[in-house]
């Protein structure tokens, strides 16, 4: 089932007529927030990790593939291209490519973003949706490790890593239980759990390449293209 275009068309209206669409509407498809443990993210080029995430409230799971790609200096800032691929049941896979500043705690401010819904051409995300109260792309929830509990040796898919069981907390006071390892870039998270979600690694490695296919168009041209495609089906 193709990702519905109604929320995206609604976004176009909201940009032109802000009162037309409520702030609660989701506009950019396939976006999920991520918990990142401060000081554990590694910007290793080509590194990738594949996770299964359980949404406890909905009792639904989805898969997320995170990868670190090439570096780029943007307006004098050291930045890195990252990609997040989200695959949800009965929905089109969505790849989000973001250019974020590199900080010691992980990805910082977003500078650019490109989104591609499976079966469609990619589009550039307007800056409006990269920062501030309207941010929809690349949301991260930093958590600070407050206690290291025990050291563990873990094996998965023939790979053996050394890890720590830790307790962490977000700025909003959300508690995070996690198993972390420096041998598992880029997230360095083997498993993490909050009251809302549980994240478990499936596999990880090196050699990641971009999954965006084709040159991105502007968001408004992309909207027009999709409307034309829908009209041609009728």
Task: Give, region by region, the residue ranges found by the protein language model.
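Acidic, serine/threonine-rich low-complexity disordered tracts
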Residues: 24-234
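Positively charged n-region of N-terminal signal peptides that target proteins for export
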Residues: 1-5
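Signal peptide processing junction and immediate N-terminal pro/mature segment
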Residues: 19-23
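Bacterial N-terminal signal peptides
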Residues: 7-18
């Amino acid at each position: 089932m193709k990702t519905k275009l109604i929320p995206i068309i609604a976004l176009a209206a909201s940009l032109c007529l802000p009162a037309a669409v409520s702030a609660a509407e989701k506009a950019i498809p396939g976006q999920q927030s991520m918990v990142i443990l401060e000081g554990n993210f590694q910007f290793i080029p080509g590194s990738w990790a594949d996770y299964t995430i359980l949404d406890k409230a909905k009792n639904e799971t989805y898969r997320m593939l995170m990868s670190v790609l090439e570096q780029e200096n943007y307006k004098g800032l050291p930045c890195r291209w990252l990609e997040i691929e989200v695959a949800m049941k009965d929905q089109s896979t969505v790849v989000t490519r973001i250019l974020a500043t590199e900080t010691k705690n992980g990805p910082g401010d977003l500078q650019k973003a490109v989104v591609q819904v499976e079966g469609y051409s990619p589009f550039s995300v307007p800056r409006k949706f990269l920062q501030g109260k309207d941010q929809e792309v690349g949301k991260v929830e930093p958590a600070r490790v407050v206690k290291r509990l025990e050291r563990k040796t873990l094996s998965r898919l023939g790979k053996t890593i050394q890890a720590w069981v830790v307790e962490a907390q977000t700025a909003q006071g959300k508690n995070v239980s996690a198993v972390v390892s420096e041998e598992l870039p880029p997230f360095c998270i083997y498993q993490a759990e909050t009251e809302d979600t549980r994240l478990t690694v499936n596999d990880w490695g090196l050699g990641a390449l971009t999954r965006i296919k084709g040159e991105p168009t502007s968001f408004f041209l992309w909207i027009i293209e999709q409307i034309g495609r829908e009209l041609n089906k009728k």
